[in-house]
């Protein structure tokens, strides 16, 4: 790698550092808002632990997709699924932001990242389908585990990302357990609110 390419990689890494402070809609079990970087870390951990249960998956490709799937949010931030507006393409904006973010990288790395992101977004390969499904499951897991605000909408998660988790047996099994946790959490959180309304 040439000196100018090394500088480009460093410039990209400095810009990508923003993901450590871009907040998501989930909260940690300690009551702190989760960052995009934290979500990506656990998504990669899930991919590493579960990829062997889906035949024909290339782990390196799967992990790369998991690492880059939210990179564009370093520029545009995270837009939670319930807050997305009809007629506005989150994917188009994220891709545009991603292109801007990776501009300092050498051409071959830019091409690889864009190709991986496009494949992920289209769910166009076994790896992309697993990455998409695990992305949804990690989000639900965090919502179930976190200390969320009092008005948190757990019911939304019962339908969230179903099409990405239904076809794979291991993801379906995880989904079944997470949905049961979600329903229990929604019920348990609603009881104190109803009591407060009666007071």
Where are these regions (language model features)?
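Alpha-helical, largely C-terminal catalytic domains
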Residues: 1-199
């Amino acid at each position: 790698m040439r000196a100018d390419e090394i500088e480009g990689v460093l410039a990209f890494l400095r810009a990508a550092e923003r993901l450590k402070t871009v907040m998501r809609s989930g909260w940690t079990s300690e009551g702190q808002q989760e960052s995009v970087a934290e979500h990506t870390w656990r998504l990669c951990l899930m991919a590493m632990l579960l990829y062997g249960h889906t035949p024909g998956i290339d782990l390196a490709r799967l992990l790369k997709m998991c690492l880059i799937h939210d990179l564009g949010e370093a520029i545009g931030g995270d837009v939670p699924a319930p807050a997305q507006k009809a007629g506005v393409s989150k994917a188009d904006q994220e891709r545009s932001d991603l292109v801007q973010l990776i501009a300092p990288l050498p051409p071959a790395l830019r091409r690889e990242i864009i190709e991986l992101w496009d494949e992920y977004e289209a769910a166009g390969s076994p790896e992309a389908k697993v990455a998409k499904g695990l992305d949804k499951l990690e989000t639900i897991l965090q919502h179930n585990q976190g200390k969320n605000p009092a008005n948190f909408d757990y019911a939304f998660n019962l339908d969230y990302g179903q099409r990405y988790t239904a076809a794979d047996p291991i993801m379906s099994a995880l989904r079944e357990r997470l949905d049961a946790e979600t329903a229990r959490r929604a019920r348990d959180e609603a009881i104190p609110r109803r009591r407060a309304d009666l007071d």
